[in-house]
Amino acid sequence: MKEVSIKIINQNEVAAIFKNRTDYVLKIVEDAFIKWANNEVLLPDKISQIFDQQTQNRINCMPATLLKDKVSGMKWVSVFPANALKSVPNVSGVMLLSEIKTGFPQAVIDGTLCTRMRTAAVGAVAAKYLARHHTRPTPPPAKFE
């Protein structure tokens, strides 16, 4: 029987991997968009379990598969907006990665920091491609009233 070895990567390790590597994070996100546009990604709809309509406390399950890379994964993210009032993070998550030849899990990764980095990078990549060329920021009015 084949032994399954699963790598556990905690938040400190994620931070160390990506420390001072903003360009790398942007490239990963940009490459993911390109792969999706080229139909190299299976990206089912997000499953959202909302526990309380008033608070919007929920857990989201977001699966995806990179076909050419032969890896499938799922991000499990809890969103509890009122946590901010308790001085605890309102978003936390974990990711599970499996290879798709045998389906064996390969890694469990703390997804909280990954979620933050991805969210920021999506905005930056969108700005790169959607901003008008040769534009400058509008200066503030000379006088505020």
Residue ranges and their predicted role:
Residues 128-131:
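Glycine- and Gly-Pro-enriched alpha-helical subdomains that act as flexible
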